[in-house]
Amino acid sequence: MTRSVELPQYSVRLEIENASGQAGLEKQITQELQSRNFNDMQLTVVEASQFKIRKAAKSFIISREENGDAAEQLALRLGLDPSCVIYRELEQNSEHISATLVLGKDFLMSGRFPARGAKS
């Protein structure tokens, strides 16, 4: 008997930067993401940190890969508009990060994550 194993369509190694101004939000979001099951996406949070240089009003995703399909799919699953995804290469990317989620002040207020059980 041959068994087939379905691999996820998207694999995202995620860095989270908290630019919302609320200390610890990056840790809460990391825990939330790790408890989620995104059907066709393997999501690994590689790093999470507080962004100390400046605050961001709006959340966005930086695709670290030229093909931004996985980052756009992640945006949809997080309740963000895929147009918020920009591309910027990450130099010296030893962690093989494929996307960076920058949490802005809007993320805190909006309840961005779709409800559990909602199609993701």
Where in this protein do the model-derived segments appear?
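BRCT (BRCA1 C-terminal) domain core and associated BRCT-interaction motifs
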Residues: 27-28, 32, 36-109
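Second-shell loop/turn segments in exported
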Residues: 12-23, 56-64
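Gram-negative outer-membrane assembly/targeting C-terminal domains
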Residues: 1, 104-120
